[in-house]
């Protein structure tokens, strides 16, 4: 009859009622259809019900057991009303107070056998695996037995399991659910990261070795070491450019200790700069040694003899230790071409501890022939060291013959390059060879 009237008592979006009330509604409709079949099609037994019965959800109360049903109040008029072709006026329908003088509709028990035989209760939910719909929800409620206009949105829940699933060892998303009781619904659960129970580390735990291990690892990186060395060199270059006197103090130190067999700054400074450039840090000091040959050596053999004799004299006198690394510089002149004389410096590095001995020579600086002849004429024929050289040096002759020329650094006036630079170039080369021959130091 409700389908024919086309009247819906509740909008589709009405919240669900208690299951007892849902079961009572179709039973009441069936009972009214059986007892009041003579009524007009325009009159429905549900018209006299107040709207709040279906539009307002009732508070959830414990369902009443069917074993003790309360008295049922008929919702249709007495069957003794005479049949009529006209519609029954609305006043004939019982008032809301009379129709619901008993318990509320949500408390009505399911229909009895007579009513249940006419209309059976709808299923609790669609038979879809993986979805669970609570028994408290009726899909036909509020739609007069028709299919709902709005599709249902059942909640998804994992299959019920007993207990808590064990957390996996690997970091995987897991669905953890508790045992589900009958008729209960579960919201969608999201995966959570599970930590390995075997790993028990605090938030402030440092890696193995602590901060010192980290610093050691970074310092041991070749690329980082190269960057630090370049930065250090740049800073040192800036300091030494602003104050050249700071160079010996900045680069002095380390395990390399060298003695130069001379107290002349032109030799000591050149050797110090070269070895500190190659080794980074080096202690270089000067100690005057005797060559025991002529002041102006002539020839390669004489120059090498003078450099070696300076080292030996310091060792014999005890000025330096027998195992001390020493560097000796000795300049000499040689006739490399007919009537062509050149000034050359000989460098000797001797390391008794490692058994290393190296020789190197500076670039050759041309010397005019007349100045060499003057030095030869000033040397007596019976000079006892004539076998090794001349009594008067070429520098002394040039200093007397030319203005603004120093006997110790006349090379600058003739070539534009100082003697210190020439010694530095040769000393840097011999320092590089010396470093290659040293055994590797343990890290």
UniProtKB/Swiss-Prot annotation:
The modification Phosphoserine is found at residue 406. PANTHER family: PROTEIN PRRC1. Belongs to the PRRC1 family. Pfam families: NTPase_I-T. It is found in: Golgi apparatus; Cytoplasm. May act as a regulator of the protein kinase A (PKA) during embryonic development. Gene3D superfamilies: 3.90.950.10. Residues 81-96, 109-134 have a biased composition (Low complexity). The keyword Signal does not apply. One of its GO terms (cellular component) is cytoplasm. The gene is Prrc1. Its main location: Golgi. Residues 1-165 are annotated as: Disordered. Residues 59-72 have a biased composition (Pro residues). Coiled coil: none annotated. Interacts with PRKAR1A; resulting in PKA activation. Keywords: Cytoplasm, Golgi apparatus, Phosphoprotein. This is Protein PRRC1. Residues 29-45 have a biased composition (Polar residues). InterPro entries: ITPase-like_fam (IPR029001), NTPase/PRRC1 (IPR026533), PRRC1 (IPR026534). One of its GO terms (molecular function) is identical protein binding.
């Amino acid at each position: 009859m409700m389908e024919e009237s086309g009247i819906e008592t509740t909008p589709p979006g009405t919240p669900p009622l208690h299951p007892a009330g849902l079961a009572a509604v179709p039973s009441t409709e069936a009972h009214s259809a059986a007892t009041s079949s003579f009524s007009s099609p325009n009159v429905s037994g549900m018209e006299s019900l107040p709207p709040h019965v279906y539009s307002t959800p009732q508070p959830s109360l414990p369902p009443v057991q069917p074993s003790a049903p309360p008295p049922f109040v008929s919702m249709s008029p007495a069957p003794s009303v005479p049949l009529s072709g006209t519609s029954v006026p609305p006043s004939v329908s019982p008032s809301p107070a009379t129709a619901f003088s008993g318990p509320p509709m949500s408390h009505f028990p399911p229909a009895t056998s007579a009513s249940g035989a006419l209309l059976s209760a709808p299923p609790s939910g669609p038979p879809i695996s993986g979805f669970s719909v609570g028994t408290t929800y009726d899909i036909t409620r509020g739609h007069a037995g028709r299919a709902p206009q709005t599709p249902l949105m059942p909640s998804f829940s994992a299959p019920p399991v007993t207990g808590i699933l064990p957390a996996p060892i690997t970091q995987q998303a897991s669905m953890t659910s508790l045992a589900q009781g009958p008729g209960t619904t579960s919201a969608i659960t999201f995966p959570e990261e599970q930590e390995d129970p075997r790993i028990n580390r605090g938030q402030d735990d440092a890696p193995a070795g602590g901060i010192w291990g980290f610093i050691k690892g970074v310092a041991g990186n070749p690329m980082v070491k190269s960057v630090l060395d370049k930065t250090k060199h740049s800073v040192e270059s800036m300091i030494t450019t602003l104050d050249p006197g700071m160079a010996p103090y900045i680069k002095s130190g380390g395990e390399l200790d060298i003695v130069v067999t001379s107290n002349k700054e032109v030799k000591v400074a050149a050797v110090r700069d070269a070895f500190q450039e190659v080794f980074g840090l080096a202690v270089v000091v000067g100690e005057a040694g005797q060559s025991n040959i002529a002041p102006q050596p002539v020839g390669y053999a004489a120059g090498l003899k003078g450099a070696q004799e300076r080292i030996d004299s310091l060792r014999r006198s005890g000025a330096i230790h027998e195992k001390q690394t020493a560097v000796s510089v000795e300049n000499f002149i040689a006739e490399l071409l007919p009537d062509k004389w050149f000034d050359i410096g000989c460098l000797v590095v001797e390391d008794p501890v490692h058994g290393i001995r190296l020789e190197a020579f500076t670039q050759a600086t041309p010397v005019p022939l007349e100045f060499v002849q003057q030095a030869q004429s000033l040397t007596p024929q019976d000079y006892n060291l004539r076998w090794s050289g001349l009594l008067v040096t070429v520098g002394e002759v040039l200093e007397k013959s030319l203005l603004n020329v120093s006997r110790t650094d006349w090379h600058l006036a003739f070539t534009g390059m100082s003697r210190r630079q020439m010694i530095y170039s040769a000393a840097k080369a011999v320092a590089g060879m010396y470093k290659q021959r040293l055994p590797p130091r343990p890290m």
